[in-house]
Curated annotation (Swiss-Prot):
GO terms for cellular component: cytosolic small ribosomal subunit; ribosome; rough endoplasmic reticulum. Keywords: Cytoplasm, Endoplasmic reticulum, Metal-binding, Ribonucleoprotein, Ribosomal protein, Zinc. The lineage of its organism: Eukaryota, Metazoa, Ecdysozoa, Arthropoda, Hexapoda. The gene is RpS29. Zn(2+) binds at residues 21, 24, 39, 42. This is Small ribosomal subunit protein uS14. It comes from Plutella xylostella.
Length: 56
């Protein structure tokens, strides 16, 4: 049983390890509200494309 078989063999059905950004696959700073599932860095990049408007 080599390293490749053991690495990431634990089931990830819930928790922080089960979710990732849909744009960059990052697991930190996820925005899950409204089903976005996008990290905060990508949200800043794609906010206008998604339809979020910045109010002054």
């Amino acid at each position: 049983m080599g390293h490749a078989n053991i690495w990431y063999s634990h089931p990830r059905k819930y928790g922080q390890g089960s979710r990732s950004c849909r744009a960059c696959s990052n697991r930190h700073g996820l925005i899950r509200k409204y089903g976005l599932n996008i990290c905060r860095q990508c949200f800043r990049e794609y906010a206008n494309d998604i339809g979020f408007k910045k109010l002054d």
